[in-house]
């Protein structure tokens, strides 16, 4: 939606006419659904063409058990043993040079059954991808029990990540 709006407004400012439908079509070609991204990368061990992925509502990513059940029942893949955050990081970690994962986290929402929360992203980075550069909003640690309520993971993030005040969408 934001890309569509921006494209139409930018075209207007430069004296061009772009229809909302055309802008939306281009935006959809630019953005891939996370589930398609996941499925595409199950088929290959190679790095994806995408260098940047944005995971909206990242706190809703699935725990290992939920993903494993889904992969077995819906995709016919037995013994899938990664959470959604760990899998996404593993796919992007295939790049030899650089890549980025941007996790957008909604505030004030309960975590539902099977959802991993922010802690699973941090746990995956801590246990398997500790060489990654991590940048996070100061809001992640500002309110106890809101985003990250595991003291060990909070401490690890503070020691290994880079806290920024300008990464919150309210900025």
Describe the residue ranges of each PLM region:
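Conserved helicase motor core of SF1/SF2 NTP-dependent helicases
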Residues: 2-18, 52-171
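Inter-Walker segment of RecA-like/P-loop motor cores
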Residues: 2-53
């Amino acid at each position: 939606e934001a890309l569509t709006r921006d494209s139409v407004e930018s075209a207007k400012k430069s004296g061009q006419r772009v229809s909302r439908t055309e802008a939306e079509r281009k935006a959809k070609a630019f953005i891939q659904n996370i589930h398609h991204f996941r499925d595409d990368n199950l088929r290959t061990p190679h790095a994806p063409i995408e260098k940047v992925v944005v995971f909206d509502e990242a706190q809703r990513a699935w725990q290992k058990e939920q993903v494993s059940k889904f992969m077995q029942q819906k995709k016919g893949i037995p013994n899938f043993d990664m959470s959604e955050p760990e899998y996404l990081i593993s796919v992007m970690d295939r790049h030899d040079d650089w890549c980025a994962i941007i996790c957008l986290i909604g505030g004030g929402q309960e975590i539902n059954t099977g959802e991993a929360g922010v802690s699973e992203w941090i746990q995956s980075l801590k246990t398997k991808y500790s060489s990654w550069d991590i940048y996070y909003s100061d809001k992640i640690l500002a309110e106890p029990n809101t985003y990250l309520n595991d003291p060990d993971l909070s401490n690890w993030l503070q020691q290994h990540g880079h806290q920024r005040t300008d990464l919150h969408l309210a900025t």
